[in-house]
């Protein structure tokens, strides 16, 4: 059996106004090589950008990988590690029987994570973690760039 490539992914989301213009930032490290990605959206939320960042990163991987994915979003980490199991059993409803917010992105993140072995890590934001700080700059810059791209799944 072939050993999976070990990829370190760092993600962050940003939103000015929440809702407002938003963006995501990604830093990916593999064997000393670094790739950065970011994009902005005209009207979205911080939580949607926190979810979209790992989705884009995982979807960019061309083969199954061992991933260490680090984010400062407890919402994303708790959701994918804990809450999603109950949501799926309940037909994407919360324990209060209300529809899961951002269900389009949760379904996409669930699908994107299936082919990989992922260690979901949390890091405190704005605490000097180099890759997280870089992701924050990428996400904020994308949000501040006056993006015109719509976030098609955003529902006010």
Curated annotation (Swiss-Prot):
Q: What does this protein do?
A: Endonuclease that specifically degrades the RNA of RNA-DNA hybrids.
List the CDD domains hit by this protein, alphabetically. Answer: RNase_HI_prokaryote_like
Q: What is the lineage of its organism?
A: Bacteria, Pseudomonadati, Pseudomonadota, Gammaproteobacteria, Alteromonadales
Can you name the source organism? Shewanella baltica (strain OS155 / ATCC BAA-1091)
The reaction(s) this protein catalyses? Endonucleolytic cleavage to 5'-phosphomonoester
Tell me the InterPro entries matching this sequence.
Answer: RNase_H, RNaseH-like_sf, RNaseH_domain, RNaseH_sf, RNaseHI
Q: Cellular location of this protein?
A: Cytoplasm
Residues in domain RNase H type-1?
3-144
UniProt protein name: Ribonuclease H
Q: Does the keyword Nucleus apply?
A: no
Cofactor: binding details: Binds 1 Mg(2+) ion per subunit. May bind a second metal ion at a regulatory site, or after substrate binding.
